[in-house]
């Protein structure tokens, strides 16, 4: 399956009734975006097709990616992430706006679940259902050498993808686990508002993760 076929098939997915209902139900709920069009479909990844770094998040935000159709775009997570990608030399611009000409260099963004879940909490069944899309999407990125999991659930989804045991690869910010073929798995706190506004994840902490990913990827 090529990239175009993947996007067409993914965005037509309705496997998870709860997620389908929620991604459509939230349209127009937030006053700031009332009247704006919403993507309200599964969100495909975004970035460099020859990426050597993959940033792997949890799921679209109801009024962020679910509205804009681009990962980490339209909410506080993106407002934190993109300036740091730009500072690290991985993005052409310090912000992501729907329909802009933003380019990512050597990095690709996607998530464990591709539809917005209620309370940002996908169920185990929803994670398993979306694992089929992870399999396809990561297969379209053969140059990736460094996988950066944003949060525990994202880490566990990647461990499942690689057939690795959770008990041998616990989540902690800054964790580094070797993968077969000279690849690497890094873990970071998620770039969510909950983490960045409380100081659990600072700009300096995340920039350090990005620079380590660049070093390991040979960028």
Swiss-Prot record:
Resulting phenotype, residue 190 to N/S: Strong decrease in UDG, HDG and XDG activities
Outcome of swapping residue 195 to A/D/E/Q: Retains much of its activity
Principal EC category: hydrolase
Residues binding [4Fe-4S] cluster, per UniProt: 13, 16, 115, 130
Effect of residue 75 to N/Q: Loss of XDG activity, but retains much of its UDG and HDG activities
GO biological process per UniProt: base-excision repair; DNA repair
Alphabetized Gene3D superfamilies for the sequence: Uracil-DNA glycosylase-like domain
UniProt GO MF annotations: 4 iron, 4 sulfur cluster binding; deaminated base DNA N-glycosylase activity; DNA-deoxyinosine glycosylase activity; metal ion binding; uracil DNA N-glycosylase activity
Keywords, sorted A to Z: 4Fe-4S, DNA damage, DNA repair, Hydrolase, Iron, Iron-sulfur, Metal-binding
Alphabetized InterPro entries for the sequence: UDG_Type-4/5 (IPR051536), UdgB-like (IPR044147), Uracil-DNA_glycosylase-like (IPR005122), Uracil-DNA_glycosylase-like_sf (IPR036895)
ATP-binding listed as a keyword: no
Entry EC number(s): 3.2.2.-
Top-level taxon of the source organism: Bacteria
Purpose of the protein: DNA glycosylase with broad substrate specificity. Can remove uracil from double-stranded DNA containing either a U/G, U/A, U/C or U/T base pair. Can also excise hypoxanthine from double-stranded DNA containing G/I, T/I, and A/I base pairs, xanthine from both double-stranded and single stranded DNA, thymine from G/T mismatched DNA, 5'-hydroxymethyluracil and 5'-fluorouracil.
Family classification: Belongs to the uracil-DNA glycosylase (UDG) superfamily. Type 5 (UDGb) family.
The protein, known as: Type-5 uracil-DNA glycosylase
Organism: Thermus thermophilus (strain ATCC 27634 / DSM 579 / HB8)
């Amino acid at each position: 399956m090529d990239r175009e076929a993947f996007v067409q098939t993914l965005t037509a997915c309705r496997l998870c009734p709860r997620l389908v209902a929620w991604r459509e139900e939230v349209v127009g709920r937030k006053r700031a975006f009332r009247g704006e069009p919403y993507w309200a479909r599964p969100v495909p990844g975004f970035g460099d097709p020859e990426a050597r770094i993959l940033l792997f998040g949890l799921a679209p935000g109801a009024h962020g990616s679910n509205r804009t159709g681009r990962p980490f775009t339209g909410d506080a997570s993106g407002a934190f992430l993109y300036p740091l990608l730009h500072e690290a030399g991985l993005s052409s611009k310090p912000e992501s706006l729907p329909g802009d000409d933003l380019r990512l260099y050597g990095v690709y963004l996607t998530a464990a679940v591709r539809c917005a879940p209620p309370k940002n909490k996908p169920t185990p069944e929803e994670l398993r259902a979306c694992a089929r899309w992870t399999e396809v999407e990561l297969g379209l990125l053969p140059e990736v050498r460094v996988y950066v999991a944003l949060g525990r659930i994202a880490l566990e989804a990647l461990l499942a993808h690689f057939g690795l045991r959770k008990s041998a690869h616990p989540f902690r910010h800054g964790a580094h686990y070797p993968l077969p073929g000279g690849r690497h798995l890094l873990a970071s706190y998620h770039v969510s508002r909950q983490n960045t506004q409380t100081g659990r994840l600072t700009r300096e902490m995340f920039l350090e993760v990005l620079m380590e990913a660049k070093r390991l990827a040979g960028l």
